[in-house]
Amino acid sequence: MIQTAIVGGGPAGAYCAGCLTENGIYPTIFDHTHPREKPCGGLVSSLAQELFPFLRHIPIEHTVKKKFYFVSPNGKKICLRDNLLGFSRLMFDQYLVNRAVEKGAELINEKVVALKRKGDFWHLKTKKQTYVTKILIGADGVNSLVRRKVIGPISKKDIGLCFGYLVNESVVEDITLIFSPYRKGYLWVIPRGRNTCFGICTTEISDSYGLKKELDMFIQKNYPNITKDSSWASLIPNIKDPRTFSVPLAGTNWILIGDAAGHVNPISGEGILYALLDGELASQAIAENSPRRFNQLWTERYGMNLFSKIKTRKWLYKKPVLELYCQTLRGISTLTP
C-alpha cells in the first residue's frame, strides 16, 4: 500500500513530493506526461525567488532579465524593472521531478484513469494495475480527475486558453507582454536562452475564437522570418468569483493543489508561484497528520491576495481601465504575482 499518492508531476506535485521527503514521508507520483513543454513562458518572478531561494540556483539553462515591457491595447509601451528568471518548462519540470526522486519519492509513469474511495483508502486504477493509498493529492491540472471525484470539476466559465509556439533560436533580448485589443488576454514574447517562446492567452474559453490567428498575425507583422518549430495549446484556471473557493480544497485524506485547486493569478496567468506555495503547504498539512488543515493554510498565506486579484480582474480588462492601469505602472520597480 502507498502512504501518500500524488496524481500529477508538474511543479505543484513534484515540489510537494520533494517537501514531503524532507519530512520523512516518501510519496509516489503518478504521471505519464511530464516533463513536457508548454506555451507558458516559464517566467519566475522576484517574489517567487524571495520565497523560494533555491530557484536562483537551479542548475539548468535559464535567462535572467532585469526589466520587461508591457504594451497597452492602444500600443503604448511601458518598461518595468524586476528580476525575472526564464526557464524552459520542460527542463524546469524535469528538475523538480528529479529532485523529488533523488530525495526518495517514487515516480510511476502511468496514467490514473479511475479513482474510488473505499473506507479510509483510495483505489487508483491505471491501465496496468490498481494501487491503494491512504492519502491522495490531486496535482493533475485544470481538468483534474481527482478534483472531479472529490468536489467536481472547475466550471467552464473559470477556464482560460493558451496557445503558443517555440522557436529554436534567440529572436529577442527583452521580455514583452502585449495586452490584446480584441479580447481579455495578452500575447507574450519571452527569450529563454537558446529559444524563444511566443504565446497568447484568453481568460475565457468563450472568447477564444481566432486566438491562434491573432498570434499568427502578430508574428507575421513583427517577426516574419522566424521558423515555428513546435506549438502547444493548454487550458488554464481563471477563477472569476472568490466564492468559487468557498468549497473546501482538502478533506480528511485528500488535497487539491496548483491548477487543480484553481490557484492561478487571474490577471497575469502566473501559476508557478502558487504551485510551489501549495506544494509546501500541502506537505505541511500532511506532516501534521491533518490534510484538511490545508484549507486554513493556503487561505491565511495568500488567500486574500488572490481574492483581491479576482475582484480586480472584473474591471481591469475593460479597455479604458486597462489603458489607465498600464500608465500607472510607469515607475513601478517590481510587480508581484
Where are each of the predicted segments found?
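Active-site flanking residues adjacent to catalytic metal/cofactor-binding acidic residues
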Residues: 7, 30, 139, 257-258
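C-terminal helical "tail/cap" subdomain of flavin- and related membrane-associated enzymes
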Residues: 283-337
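A conserved beta-strand/loop capping segment in the N-terminal third of enzymes
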Residues: 43-99
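Predominantly flavin-linked oxidoreductase catalytic cores and closely associated redox partners
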Residues: 9, 99-229, 246, 262
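Glycine-rich FAD pyrophosphate-binding loop
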Residues: 5-9, 18-40
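FAD/FMN-dependent oxidoreductases across multiple families
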Residues: 114, 206-282, 292-293
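N-terminal Rossmann-fold NAD(P) dinucleotide-binding loop
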Residues: 13-14
